[in-house]
């Protein structure tokens, strides 16, 4: 209703101003600004819906000030360009319409009415309401009733008798199981759901709407609100260190806790969270690659669901035979947005909707089959009678190719329980949320019926039942939940441990690299993660007087304040203010002690602008002084004009990447020498080893042969045509996720370059 009212007010404002207000520059500018704000707000809402599937939520507030890198970003570039072009066109059209009667005399009354209607349209818009609520949530001090509702359970289960298998289905919300809306989409897992305790109204709340947040909510009974962006939690050394979570209780009760997934455990700090709360046995992509049947059978995120669930079954068998009490948690990945992935062993590889194949529905149908196969193996085993099986979605599906169809339904998270000891078949329509999952499991296992803000849906009352405005209430508790981190409020001294790649201050520990904004009463950590911008881009958003401490590889800050360190990959510490003074210190000891020193200086806006502009230079445009191309640092030597076909810097160098160009091309600013030696330190990837690799300068071509280990080769070139471009053509680029950023599409690797040097020959 508010959308219609808001749009009606917007339209009325446009029409009244265009046909009645007349000519006046100030009123035109004011009305266009407010109407433009309405357009921007609604486009922001549309864009946020596209990325999150949940409007302008807590995650969007972070994304608005940081670049989105990570899973499937290339799939969002075209919509992003479309939004920018559409916004430009709308503003142009709006200005043209408002000035239609610019030759008529100004009318104060109609101008005022048009402006008031425009302001009303903004105030009535859902986007404005969502942003207002988010901003309020950032500035609140908390809610006095938090302590009354947050309850810590007993640290043990008195007499545990059941093992636990807990399956997180990536984005596998309950909506998919509506057979009327999506016929025969989930027959295998749907049948199992109908055999157990099926909780049909599991709501998604703020701070529970992405994987690590859903895991924290379901195991600790609190949303994931932190002093930093949630997916950047890989940089912390402990996770809600004071809280009692399900894993802690299980471990204290004699359980061995296991977690198995196909993706890298470090992503979003799942390893830190689980290790902080009772899990001693973790298996992700790195741990599984030495034990799975086919280590090369992977998708963009890691191992496919059939591989992961096979390993989970082996672990279930092994643990059950041992007779020890255990919990086994597993997380699937094949249903990850935007398209999902199809395991090769499932029978349901294709699902048509609206008369055409739909990749996301196909991935859901395949993944649910794999999950059902795993559960049926457990049910058929002699150990089922001692086992509780839980299946839940980690969060609602984000914007995938099925999302517009999901939005036509009443959407809820999946949560059902199959008890081997006491079969129960019932659909429970009680209002609940993700935070109730852990408390419900704890209740079934014989423990308390509460966990944090969660309550057992079998014997307690959910916060979703107590509070009709539970989303707003959750946001009101946000400051209270952030305080549970016990995060320091000051930073005077710090220690850098090079062996562990950690920084410690005021009792807290973070992984490097790290950027910190330091004020009188707050220290704000800004870690680098798969979903955040590089730290230098985050620093570029700081105000001129903001105090910062930036710990990163020396070459990343060298172009600003320490050119002598431009080729150093050691750790450096920079601190100061962008508009004031900055210092760079080289970390030259294994354990390095530092102190913060922020001088109260006069802010120089020219210096500030120069620093910001330099920080925002993209990697490929960075230039450094050197007599060779060093590939393990960003940028290129000053003599290089541009280059292509080369991937990002890694600790050893850079790979060629045929996704960026079929050949490695390095164009120099000036012609290469008439006679020169080309000294190449490099290695080959896969089938490119021991194969002739063409290297061309102008009309002359030499052959390079590389192995799988780094070697140095010298090629002799004559350059009579004064060519300025070096071209290297890997013969057989290989599509692989080797060394890839989690969630990115595979790269096509050919050769790995460490250094290329041009040495002029005399004569």
Curated annotation (Swiss-Prot):
Lineage, opening ranks: Bacteria, Pseudomonadati, Pseudomonadota, Gammaproteobacteria, Enterobacterales
Domain of life: Bacteria
Entry-linked Gene3D superfamilies: Alkaline Phosphatase, subunit A
Protein name (record): Phosphoglycerol transferase I
Reaction catalyzed: a phosphatidylglycerol + a membrane-derived-oligosaccharide D-glucose = a 1,2-diacyl-sn-glycerol + a membrane-derived-oligosaccharide 6-(glycerophospho)-D-glucose
Biological role: Transfers a phosphoglycerol residue from phosphatidylglycerol to the membrane-bound nascent glucan backbones.
Predominant cellular place of this UniProt entry's protein: membrane
Family to which the UniProt record says this protein belongs: Belongs to the OpgB family.
GO annotation, biological process: glucan biosynthetic process
Subcellular compartments: Cell inner membrane
Single Gene Ontology MF annotation: phosphatidylglycerol-membrane-oligosaccharide glycerophosphotransferase activity
Transmembrane segments: 1-21, 26-46, 77-97, 108-128
Top class in the EC scheme: transferase
GO cellular component, as recorded: membrane; plasma membrane
Pathway: Glycan metabolism; osmoregulated periplasmic glucan (OPG) biosynthesis
EC number: 2.7.8.20
